[in-house]
Amino acid sequence: MNFENLLIEVGTEELPPKALRTLAESFLTSFTDELTKADLPFESAVWYAAPRRLAINVLGLALAQADKVVEKRGPAVSSAFDADGNPTKAAQGWARGNGITVEQAERLVTDKGEWLVHQAKVVGVETKSLIADMAQRALDKLPIPKPMRWGNNKTQFIRPVHTVTMLLGSELVAGELLGITSNRIIRGHRFMGKASFELDHADNYLAALKEQGKVLADYELRKSLIKADAEAAAAKLGGIADIQDGLLEEVASLVEWPIVLTASFEEKFLNVPSEALVYTMKGDQKYFPVFDKAGKLLPNFIFVTNIESKDPQQIISGNEKVVRPRLADAEFFFNTDKKNTLESRIASLETVVFQKQLGTLKARVERISELAGFIATQMNNNGVETNSVDASRAGLLSKTDLMTNMVMEFTDTQGTMGMHYARLDGETEAVAIALEEQYKPKFSGDTVPTATVSCAVALAEKLDTLVGIFGIGQAPKGAADPFALRRAAIGILRVIVENKLPLDLVELIAKAQALHATNITNTNTSDDVLEFLLARFRAWYQDKGIQVDVILAVLARRPTKPADFDSRVKAVSHFRGLEASTALAAANKRVSNILAKVEGELPATINSALLTEPAEKALADKLVQLQPQLAPLFADGNYQQALTLLADLRENVDQFFEDVMVMADDEALKNNRLALLTNLREQFLHVADISLLQ
């Protein structure tokens, strides 16, 4: 079998930068899936992407499918010949359809009889004749939410397509993609190098584009070059560049020939909170801010241009002129906002509707304030020192920064600007920090607040939304979640679990519902919210790699304290790894099945005088021996140690089921043994329903 390297490039108008990686990865995955379905082996495959092109390179691709033999079964011999031994019409028709005579057919004997068969040789198809159709199917599967048409073309794609190149080694693959006929023309950089050139071989794609077209088609190479050059530029300034991967990806998707330059802005702008300046530089301009080693913003920024200029200073000056008005706006907004305190803005929240049925933002902050104070009190009552006055105050001020000029213009600074303005207003540091941290965690992988006041406010903010929206019957359906309730639910669970807060969801939900008063129309709000949170718990732990049966075993106990839930999950996960776990899980399942069949109330008291068999005596004695050790462990939530102790019951339990007839004819003996099993099961149920472990 012969092999060659394949290149496919689709040349387009500028592609959406935030979608570039996804498009390229999807193209590669779908195309290699097509190769696999077509029985075309290959060594490896990579994708390339730049603002005006998507490309895939398949290495070591077979030039044709392998020939194969396909067994085509015909009629049974019993129905293939008549009484005289002549072929029937059915046999003749089958043979004719396969291009043979009945006499040429082979016979296959199976346990169900004897059959006529034909071993048909199927010649493999040349790869080059399959490529275009496979590539088109792969392109059709790209995740394109809003495809577009261009010119008189009925073809749809994410952006207009200008060129298509398909090369198998040096051979041009015939065919069309997206209405464009395959040719050797590759377009270069818009302003540098050759506008277009012909590619002679698939292996020369990257080098020819770089040398002739001034385009670095290797996405990861562009990304690494930008990062390295930006870090070096920042080091020359004595600082560190803020190069978050999301922005780096976007910048790498905007340029074909990245050139990193350094610029500056007036130091007076550093009097504005750095978050607002950074938001402007990163969000609007796609610049990399620079900080000193102490984390203080420097009056410099790093940007990436798509052209190698003879006069880079002109480009630098141009970018400085562009960013200055934005920084001046931030300075103006900050100085204007400082003239009014956050407290003075509370009244204006009455003019903003949070949600039609749930009232205004003023009503919302009043609910958050009371709920945050309640949560802080609950934390205090359970040994976690929290200033409930600060929690209530932070809740009341939590949305006031939404009424400032800065946040209205730079929306992503909400919370952060609240913190800065609170400090200027003389609010306590705990209140100021809580205003910023109320929204945490904002995304998957984000940190959670750790300060107790911040935790109380963050929980209150999320619970108010969750209970309110569920209360008016607008729970998430399918993928739709307009109020981000799933994120809020995960946030609630993470704040409680990661800070080990002794809080009960039932109590928090009940308080939040009471504060909504007449807003609530759903009579099952509390139950619905709790079920939603428990479902999020399951999803969260699954994402962390916890086995489903472990989660279900804990969920069966319906623990409503997330920190306690977490301890149980960790304990059961540990127990699952013990040698005794499989046998004890099976025994618990057997016990559950036996007890489920008992009519009426289960016997609860074990009468030692009725323990007649050595195995049941040994099990009862072991339980009596363990209970004084288990009780304090259950009380302290030390479930892992408790289950480790219970694992010692394995031999006793195995021997019990080996030697003892539970459902004895003697009613007293039977009930006593049922009581023993009830007691055994209850010890495990203090932690989880172990019978659900697989």
From Swiss-Prot:
E.C. numbers = 6.1.1.14
The keyword Protease is annotated on this UniProt entry: no
What is one Gene Ontology biological process annotated in the Swiss-Prot or TrEMBL record?
Answer: arginyl-tRNA aminoacylation
One of its Pfam families is tRNA_synt_2f
Top enzyme class of this protein? ligase
What InterPro entries is this protein classified in? Answer: DALR_anticod-bd, Gly-tRNA-synth_bsu, Gly-tRNA-synth_heterodimer, tRNAsynth_Ia_anticodon-bd
The primary location reported for this protein is cytoplasm
Entry keywords, A to Z: Aminoacyl-tRNA synthetase, ATP-binding, Cytoplasm, Ligase, Nucleotide-binding, Protein biosynthesis
* UniProt-annotated location(s): Cytoplasm
Presence of keyword Aminoacyl-tRNA synthetase: yes
Q: Which reaction does it catalyse?
A: tRNA(Gly) + glycine + ATP = glycyl-tRNA(Gly) + AMP + diphosphate
| PROSITE patterns in the cross-refs | AA_TRNA_LIGASE_II_GLYAB
This protein's GO CC annotations: cytosol
Q: Name one GO molecular function term.
A: glycine-tRNA ligase activity
What family is reported? Belongs to the class-II aminoacyl-tRNA synthetase family.
Entry's HAMAP family?
Answer: Gly_tRNA_synth_beta (MF_00255)
Quaternary state and partners of this protein?
Tetramer of two alpha and two beta subunits.
Name under which the protein is recorded: Glycine--tRNA ligase beta subunit
